[in-house]
């Protein structure tokens, strides 16, 4: 299987990963959304250090 065939199959299988055309401008933002839970975890440490880990 060549790389081109693999890429085509992968795109067809990931059709649900594509945003509808109306939401296309938000595509770069959607790519970064999975980092939000990590930011909340870091915020918890910043908060606890601010209150001296009570």
Swiss-Prot record:
Membrane topology label: Single-pass membrane protein
TM ranges: 33-53
Key words of the record: Chloroplast, Membrane, Photosynthesis, Photosystem II, Plastid, Reaction center, Thylakoid, Transmembrane, Transmembrane helix
GO cellular component: chloroplast thylakoid membrane; photosystem II reaction center
One GO BP: photosynthesis
Domain of life from the UniProt record: Eukaryota
Keyword Cell wall biogenesis/degradation attached: no
Propeptide positions: 1-17
Compartment(s) where it occurs, according to its Swiss-Prot or TrEMBL record: Plastid, Chloroplast thylakoid membrane
Record family assignment: Belongs to the PsbK family.
Function: One of the components of the core complex of photosystem II (PSII). PSII is a light-driven water:plastoquinone oxidoreductase that uses light energy to abstract electrons from H(2)O, generating O(2) and a proton gradient subsequently used for ATP formation. It consists of a core antenna complex that captures photons, and an electron transfer chain that converts photonic excitation into a charge separation.
Matches recorded under HAMAP family: PSII_PsbK
Name recorded for this polypeptide: Photosystem II reaction center protein K
Organism, scientific name: Euglena deses
Gene that this sequence comes from: psbK
